[in-house]
Regions:
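N-terminal pre-P-loop "Q-motif" helix
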Residues: 114-135
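Conserved two-lobed SF2 helicase motor
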Residues: 209-231, 238, 423-437
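Post-DEXD/H (motif II) to motif III coupling segment of the RecA-like Helicase ATP-binding lobe
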Residues: 253-257, 262-324
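Conserved helicase motor "Helicase C" RecA-like lobe of SF1/SF2 P-loop NTPases
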Residues: 387-414
Length: 522
C-alpha cells in the first residue's frame, strides 16, 4: 500500500500523503520553516517573536489528502526524517520525476551583442549558470556589477519563453531592460498587472502564447491569485475566481524560464511562487542575500543553497567615500523615537517636523552637506539623492532644496511619483522603499543619508545606489544623532555591515555655528 506520492520538479517537490501518521511527522519536520514577526504582548509588556508565514505550501486535494509543496533543498532531509520516523520504503512511495520534462516553448530572443559586451566576470558567471545541472541559480553580485545585463544574456541563450516576476515598482525598469537588451522583442513582450489582466491571460492562453515570448508579472498580482488556491477547501475554492490552478498556469503559456529580481525583498512571496510554478530554468537576482538575523539566513539557505549562488571571487574595488556626520540635539532622548517594537525613524522624523525651530536647524544641516558634497563638486548631469524615512520629510526637503537651488531640478520620488523624476532630477528626495533597491540612477555622485538603521540589506543596498564613475569621488554622507543612544547603536551596526564597501571611512561632528554645539529645540 502506498503511503505517499512524491513528485519532483526543478525548483520544488510535492508530497501527497495517504497515511495519517505521516501527516503528523511532516508537520513536525516543517515546524522551523516559518518567517517570524514581532508582536506586542500586553501580558509581558514587550514585543515577542511569533510565527508569520510558512516557507512551504499545504492544502487538501480533491480527495481530502494532505498535500505539501516544499523547496528542493529539503528533499533529502525530508526523506531521511520520514524514513526514520514513518517506516517508509521504496515500495510505499509513488515516485514521479519531472526534472527532465520540458515545459517551455522555443522563442528566438536575441541579445544585442553589438550594443552590450559582457565583462570577463560576467562571462564566467554566465557559463557557470548555463552549465549548472540543477537549472536553478542565483546571481549574487554586488550592486553596480551588472546583474540585469548578465541575466538578460543568460536568458537569451536558453531560447525559450520567459516569465519575469518582480515587484510592481520595478515593472517600468524591466520594460526598459527588455527593450534595451532584446531589440527583436519590441512587440513580443507584455506586462501583466491586476486580476483582470491575469484572468484574461488564463482564458486566452493560446492566443497570448502565440503573440508573446516575454511575460512580465507583478508579484502582488500573482500572490493575490495564488492565495486563493491556498485554500482548497469548501465553497470558497469551488467558486474558482481564477480558472487555472497555479501549478498548471506557466505550462499553458509555454514558459520555460523564470526570472526574479531583488529576491531578498519579499522572500516569502518568491518562495511561494517557486513552489507552484513549473519551469525548466530558474534564475534569481540580488546583491544582498544575507541578513544579520540567523533565522533569516537559515531560510535563505533553504530557499537557495550556497552552492547555487554565483558571484565574484575577487574584490570589486571600493570607490565610495563615506562621511559619518555626528550631530547633537538638545535633550534628544525626549524626542519621540520609540514604539513597542523598538526604534522608529518615522517617529523621530515626525518629532522634528512638528518643531519648526528644530526643523529649520535640521534643514540648515542638510543643506550644508548637499552644498559641500554635491554642489561644490558638481559637473553637468551629476545627481544627488537625499534619503528620508517619511514621505512628509521628503516633500519638506524638496521644498527647502528648491528654494536654495532654483536653477536645479529638484523632485521627490515617493509613492505615486513618476519614475522619470528619479532619472531626470538633479536632486531627488526619496525613501528606502522607493529608491533604496533595484534602481540605477545615471551619474549619481552623492547620497545624503538622514536615516539611522541597522539592517545589513538596507544599508548595503542604499549605499550601493552609488555606481563607479571614472575620475569622480562618489560620496555617501550619513547623519546620525550623537546623543541619542539608539542612533549610536545603529551607527555601529551600519559600520559593521558597510565599512568593507568604502574606499574611505571618515568621522566628523556637525556644529550649527562657532558658539553652539547642538541643535536647539526652541
Amino acid at each position: 500500500m502506498k503511503k505517499l506520492k512524491l513528485e519532483i520538479n526543478v525548483s520544488h517537490f510535492v508530497v501527497t500523503l495517504y497515511d495519517k501518521i505521516l501527516e503528523n511527522i511532516t508537520r513536525d519536520f516543517l515546524s522551523p520553516y516559518w518567517s517570524y514577526k514581532f508582536e506586542y504582548n500586553k501580558n509581558i509588556r514587550r514585543a515577542i517573536r511569533v510565527k508569520d508565514k510558512p516557507f512551504f505550501v499545504n492544502y487538501l486535494d480533491e480527495d481530502n489528502h494532505e498535500v505539501y509543496r516544499l523547496h528542493k533543498s529539503l528533499l533529502k532531509p525530508y526523506l531521511g526524517y520520514i524514513g526514520a520516523n514513518g517506516k517508509i520504503s521504496s515500495d510505499t512511495v509513488e515516485l514521479i520525476n519531472n526534472t527532465k520534462t520540458k515545459h517551455g516553448n522555443y522563442a528566438n530572443i536575441e541579445f544585442d551583442h553589438k550594443k552590450f559586451t559582457l565583462r570577463d566576470y560576467q562571462e564566467r558567471i554566465s557559463k557557470s549558470v548555463l552549465e549548472n545541472p540543477e537549472h536553478f541559480s542565483m546571481i549574487n553580485l554586488n550592486v553596480g556589477l551588472g546583474k540585469s545585463l548578465t541575466a538578460c544574456y543568460i536568458l537569451s541563450e536558453l531560447k525559450t519563453k520567459i516569465a519575469i516576476v518582480i515587484l510592481s515598482k520595478y515593472l517600468e525598469k524591466w520594460e526598459e531592460d527588455v527593450l534595451k537588451h532584446y531589440p527583436n522583442m519590441k512587440d513580443r513582450y507584455i506586462v501583466i498587472q491586476g486580476g483582470d489582466a491575469l484572468r484574461d491571460l488564463m482564458v486566452n492562453a493560446e492566443e497570448y502564447k502565440k503573440k508573446y515570448d516575454i511575460f512580465i508579472f507583478s508579484i502582488r498580482t500573482l500572490m493575490n491569485y495564488i492565495n486563493v488556491y491556498d485554500n482548497r477547501k469548501g465553497d470558497v475554492f469551488l467558486l474558482k475566481e481564477y480558472p487555472v490552478a497555479p501549478e498548471n498556469f506557466i505550462q499553458r503559456l509555454g514558459i520555460g524560464a523564470f526570472l526574479n529580481d531583488e529576491s531578498h525583498q519579499e522572500p516569502g512571496s518568491v518562495s511561494k511562487i517557486l513552489l507552484y510554478f513549473q519551469c525548466d530554468f530558474y534564475l534569481l537576482l540580488t546583491a544582498t542575500f544575507n541578513s544579520n538575523d540567523p533565522h533569516t539566513v537559515k531560510m535563505y539557505k533553504m530557499l537557495v543553497p550556497e552552492r547555487l549562488r554565483f558571484n565574484l571571487e575577487t574584490d570589486r574595488g571600493n570607490y565610495i567615500k563615506v562621511n559619518n556626520v555626528r550631530y547633537y540635539i538638545e535633550k534628544a532622548p525626549k524626542l519621540r523615537h520609540q514604539t513597542n517594537q523598538g526604534y522608529s525613524q518615522v517617529l523621530f522624523e515626525q518629532s522634528i517636523l512638528s518643531r519648526p525651530y528644530l526643523l529649520a536647524q535640521f534643514d540648515k544641516m542638510v543643506l550644508k552637506y548637499v552644498e559641500r558634497d554635491y554642489i561644490e563638486k558638481r559637473k553637468p548631469g551629476y545627481k544627488c539623492l537625499v534619503y528620508a524615512a517619511t514621505v512628509d520629510m521628503c516633500k519638506h526637503l524638496m521644498v527647502v532644496l528648491r528654494k536654495e537651488y532654483p536653477k536645479l531640478t529638484v523632485n521627490t520620488y515617493v509613492q505615486e511619483d513618476d519614475y522619470q523624476n528619479l532619472m531626470t532630477s538633479d536632486i531627488t528626495a526619496s525613501t528606502p522603499g522607493s529608491a533604496g533597491v533595484g534602481v540605477d540612477i545615471p551619474y549619481l555622485s552623492t547620497i545624503i543619508q538622514t536615516i539611522s538603521m541597522g539592517s545589513l540589506q538596507a544599508n548595503r543596498q542604499m549605499m550601493g545606489r552609488l555606481r563607479k564613475i571614472d575620475g569622480v569621488d562618489t560620496t555617501y554622507t550619513a547623519l546620525y544623532c550623537g546623543n541619542l543612544r539608539k542612533h549610536k547603536d545603529l551607527y555601529k551596526q551600519r559600520e559593521t555591515c558597510t565599512k568593507d564597501f568604502a574606499k574611505e571611512w571618515r568621522y566628523e561632528t556637525y556644529r550649527p555655528n562657532a558658539w553652539e554645539s547642538e541643535l536647539k529645540l526652541r
